[in-house]
Amino acid sequence: HHFGTEIDVSDAKAIPENYEVQLTTAECDGMFAPFHAWLSERIETGKSFGFTRVFVPGRGKIQPEKWHLSHLPTARKIQERFSESALKEIFERSEISCKEAILSEFPVLLQNYIYPYFI
């Protein structure tokens, strides 16, 4: 997950027998809707033990994911230590197949997929 400080959640009691959770918007708006309404209320009132949703409408290029929670106090510690140059160096030294595409679009990728989620 994004910074290593996230978890995906669902309501185990709402899962039908033999159903495999897909983590989709349809599930969140369907069988998991009561759970996500409860969770939203907890987040909005500061009763979520530091967990929040970062993939929300209007933030960055990652589609909203109600099930994806970030532990904000821990994520912020990592964000404070984030280094563009260190990340770029990792890609430069890597054997990843799309390295040139990543490096050529590096500033755009940071602006669309990294920095919007620093909250």
Predicted regions and their residues:
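Cell-envelope/glycan interface and biosynthesis
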Residues: H1-I119
